[in-house]
Amino acid sequence: MALVNDHPNETNYLSKQNSSSSEDLSSPGLDQPDAAYAGGGGGGGSASSSSTMNSDHQQHQGFVFYPSGEDHHNSLMDFNGSSFLNFDHHESFPPPAISCGGSSGGGGFSFLEGNNMSYGFTNWNHQHHMDIISPRSTETPQGQKDWLYSDSTVVTTGSRNESLSPKSAGNKRSHTGESTQPSKKLSSGVTGKTKPKPTTSPKDPQSLAAKNRRERISERLKILQELVPNGTKVDLVTMLEKAISYVKFLQVQVKVLATDEFWPAQGGKAPDISQVKDAIDAILSSSQRDRNSNLITN
């Protein structure tokens, strides 16, 4: 396969035969710039076309081409695309060199830049490689022949990555959007159910009466605790026992004081202690009988 250059002042595209082939594929017409121009007259077009057709029948072949630093739309290959065959560069970098070579099992592709940087793509099928980059000869209405490349044959790595990355990014965005949407609804529903409601205690007459009764009992116990000797220093049960004993003692005292026998008349003789003791016992026994009778009747 022979590729041609559209600039007479630049180095021509030279085709070279692979080590496995013995036939020289270069055309003598490529030595002259005017004859190597693909869009020129009939002589140059026929030479390049014949060399191209001869090279397509070869199974093992390779080519080396050196594109110019300038970008023209009438060149052999479109170098403005986003593929790895893009030679659009700044003026500070030298024009890269691209070489393709084939072997019996496959081919390789690499291009070199002036800064000792090389990029290689290996393990390519030779037949597939030739199908991708081989041009078709077309004839213009003026009778001139030109090279035509189909957009479907251009293989790009950048566009492939760009076509895959938006899908993955879009899937991630849609996934996160779908996952966060139900969670928001769920959280809003839970918060709506768990809102604290104002507690309104009903005005129950029984509850109010029980509350008042407890308050009165507490007040009475506090008063009794103050009346019983040392009532504030003991617990409630002990305080109640002391209060009971104290009340009994007071009852006896009242009965003793109410008996006229224990109080002599003015100028009279005081009673004996034994008499007073017997009188107290009688009072206590009578009070005990009265208490027992009250319990039986109740």
UniProtKB/Swiss-Prot annotation:
Organism: Arabidopsis thaliana
Name this protein carries in UniProt: Transcription factor RHD6
Stretches that traverse the bilayer: none
Any GO BP: root hair initiation
Protein's cellular compartments: Nucleus
Assembly and interaction partners: Homodimer. Forms heterodimers with RSL1. Interacts with TIFY10B/JAZ2, TIFY6A/JAZ4, TIFY5A/JAZ8, TIFY7/JAZ9 and TIFY9/JAZ10.
Tissue: Expressed constitutively in flowers. Expressed in root epidermal hair cells.
PANTHER family referenced in this protein's UniProt entry, alphabetically: TRANSCRIPTION FACTOR BHLH83-LIKE, TRANSCRIPTION FACTOR HEC3-RELATED
An example molecular function term from Gene Ontology annotations: protein dimerization activity
